Amino acid sequence: MLRTIRLTTAIVCFTLITLLFLDFTGTLHTWFGWLAKIQFLPALLALNIGVVLFLIVLTFLFGRIYCSVICPLGVFQDIVSWVSGKQKKNRFRYSPAMKWLRYSVLGVFIIMMVAGLNSLAILLAPYSAYGRIASNLFAPVWQWGNNLLAYFAERMDSYAFYEVDIWIKSLSTMLIAIVTLVVLFILAWRNGRTYCNTICPVGTVLGIISKYAIFKPIIDTSKCNNCGLCARNCKASCINPKAHEIDYSRCVTCMDCIGKCKHGAITYTRWKPKNETATNEDTKAKSVTTEQVDNARRSFLSASAIFATTSVLKAQEKKVDGGLATIEDKKIPQRENPIYPPGALSARNFTQHCTACQLCVSVCPNQVLRPSDNLLTLMQPEMSYERGYCRPECTKCSEVCPAGAIHLTSLAEKSAIQIGHAVWIKENCVPLTDGMECGNCARHCPTGAIQMVASNPEKTDSPKIPVVNVEKCIGCGACENLCPSRPFSAIYVTGHQMHRII
């Protein structure tokens, strides 16, 4: 029963989280966006103390339920492992924990996060890794299927579906997603939860807490006949059948061992110290030494202190920061500074909180957000206006961000946030290069920051050119996107390091 409940809940959570990345309309986020906000690392970076405490208490009570139910990457590995198990059953075996590797990776991860090297650290973040896979690899297939339905529906005079553009947002991010998928697939196919118990920093932290979980799978040595069936079905490879022991730091509470044991020797129940449960027949049971307990406590307290310090540092940073031309694709201009969405507050706040999960990229209806190719901000979204511009009536990216990189922003607030300003390039402007009237940028500026004036003040009939009022420009990119000049726009937006209210 427990295994069935766990499987059902995990499948529902996994399906809904995956759909959040596939849903290009953003409709599902109204009801299920909270599933992204209860992921451990995004909640920690967002200083969402309520969620972090909830996950810690959940782990302390029931073990690593988060890893087996809530984390989409963990459930994805379970699916791969389940398919693999159809061909070869009882293929797992116990293996000793590689503590040196687990804690080394965790230490490096925390150091990189504190040092601001998020673009490297987030390569290991489980939720973000799955988000990149879903956004870059699964979403194009989903969109292709949608376009196929739209094609046939249109011929039946139905407009229930509409076509969407399928495009590569970032080649480097897609390649990283492919490599991540291949590595995880191989590990899960061969060894189940190897990644979760050797590399994943979230799994290591929750593993330290789960050692002290109140409810755990317990082996009743009086019923166990040493058949080893539980160990051969343990995807975490954490059951030592010879010693009748379970490594609770690696156990993901999947309940598979309980369902496989034919003698009822494993039950999920309240843990008791061995000296309370030992019987005369159970001569093989070993009491936990004071030294082991002290070491475990030190590990737990050390990890807790490091993570608490990280949270405080992030909090302090947050306070301080406070058709006239040939039709061809536009090229990205060389911007002085990258552009970050309204609600990001500043470049510093955005880059230090963003986990590059690509959720905002997936829901952006105007195709403005795309992953960065810059090494220091690799995979973190930034704005570019070749395919669209940031419309004043859209705040979807701020609604879905789970990590606090983009703060929730109302429509009124967004219209007053200056994320950058427009820069005019005289050499590319159509009225001067082709001698034709234009004014596209001025007509579509939502704030009236662009005015058309005579290029020669002494001649009223001279071609009119745009003049940008930097104080009124909010950097939405309408001018850049709608400029007919090719391949580079005659006007482009450069970002501000610190966003301003105008």
Where are these regions (language model features)?
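Non-ligating segments of multi-cofactor redox enzymes
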Residues: 1-244, 249-250, 256-502
